[in-house]
Amino acid sequence: MKNEKRKTGIEPKVFFPPLIIVGILCWLTVRDLDAANVVINAVFSYVTNVWGWAFEWYMVVMLFGWFWLVFGPYAKKRLGNEPPEFSTASWIFMMFASCTSAAVLFWGSIEIYYYISTPPFGLEPNSTGAKELGLAYSLFHWGPLPWATYSFLSVAFAYFFFVRKMEVIRPSSTLVPLVGEKHAKGLFGTIVDNFYLVALIFAMGTSLGLATPLVTECMQWLFGIPHTLQLDAIIITCWIILNTICVACGLQKGVRIASDVRSYLSFLMLGWVFIVSGASFIMNYFTDSVGMLLMYLPRMLFYTDPIAKGGFPQGWTVFYWAWWVIYAIQMSIFLARISRGRTVRELCFGMVLGLTASTWILWTVLGSNTLLLIDKNIINIPNLIEQYGVARAIIETWAALPLSTATMWGFFILCFIATVTLVNACSYTLAMSTCREVRDGEEPPLLVRIGWSVLVGIIGIVLLALGGLKPIQTAIIAGGCPLFFVNIMVTLSFIKDAKQNWKD
């Protein structure tokens, strides 16, 4: 009995430090929101202006790593001795479906507006040149480059899972080949795990902070319920209670079904927007944008704007590269777990093709629709953002479509389900990472899952209370800094161990 308690109990050294750190930061923020915003702006400016170049070089180096994996000595190595667990079609679909979160729907619908209103390269706002580059930059930020950079971590985790047969629930477990077992299981490994967990908590709170206003704005549009911070807090509380009920009553199968419904509904909604918005324009705009991407790719890769100091690469490229860095471990573990039996080359190509198709389709359809609505003066996004906030502007891009009531119901259900599955995934991932010896496939303790879902919910509410996108962007960038080094260490650990143990 004692052994069972030990197995399912919390791991104090990785449970309490993140809890205390995040709790203190939330308390300090709530005490003085104005002072918190000043600090947030200072942190954002420092990291993006002083260290933005490091994130850009990280992505470029990891891109070269993708080519090394695809064409190097490990390209034909198989990740495990078993045949692939899923058919190729199912495998690609699972990767495709993993990109349909509410946060992705948020950025896909509004991102292009920011690119054309505050464009890069000194272009005039809302000019023809700005509009030509608008979607191209979305394809850059959400295309082959970031997915290729995930390859190293995905291959690394798949190698540790299926070749080395390691139980990996925290990144420190993978660092034994690099720093030795003493350091990986000692203070150094504990620090690494705490960096990972604090960053992950803020990332998940950020996603919740993006998703919640979409749901509450839908409720205002459909039911006339005014969107307030109190309503946001009530909705987040309802999600936490619903997640608790699902876990306590063993309804995890229902959550998985909801995840599948989310995927199919997202395809249906995207198909609807594609048809009624203007399929011909969308395809033409996409084709032109791919050409613009190829033409400007070298400059996009290394654009830091140190002379004109317009702020575009700091506000967007560095922010998104930090976004990719902060989610890299969690996403790579998922991609690795569904890729057992694949070769390294298959995994690398599958990620770039399957995941790029997902994000490119979503950004092309939603971004093109937003641009059409702006060009036709159907909606005034600047006024909507100034008066009501970004979420209202996003809702209006959907409400402007034909059969608006049916469309809004579909979008409301999609966002609600996406956030339910988000809260469930947040609580599960954090609980697994902070409990002692909970193995894959086992359920972590209920109270631990509830506790983490409550904390993530609090972070979402705090970010919403601060208002605007800058706090959300800063939370991602601040969290991305320590994981920048953690990701590199996991990659180097894989390379070192593979050279010694993955020979013919």
Swiss-Prot record:
PANTHER family membership: HIGH-AFFINITY CHOLINE TRANSPORT PROTEIN-RELATED, L-CARNITINE_GAMMA-BUTYROBETAINE ANTIPORTER
Protein role: Catalyzes the exchange of L-carnitine for gamma-butyrobetaine.
Catalysed reaction, written as an equation: 4-(trimethylamino)butanoate(in) + (R)-carnitine(out) = 4-(trimethylamino)butanoate(out) + (R)-carnitine(in)
Membrane topology listed for this record: Multi-pass membrane protein
Protein family (similarity comment): Belongs to the BCCT transporter (TC 2.A.15) family. CaiT subfamily.
The protein's assembly and partners: Homotrimer.
Organism: Escherichia coli O81 (strain ED1a)
Localization annotation: Cell inner membrane
Superkingdom of this protein's organism: Bacteria
GO MF annotation list: (R)-carnitine:4-(trimethylammonio)butanoate antiporter activity
Residue spans crossing the bilayer: 10-30, 51-71, 92-112, 143-163, 195-215, 231-251, 263-283, 316-336, 347-367, 398-418, 446-466, 475-495
Name the UniProt record assigns to this protein: L-carnitine/gamma-butyrobetaine antiporter
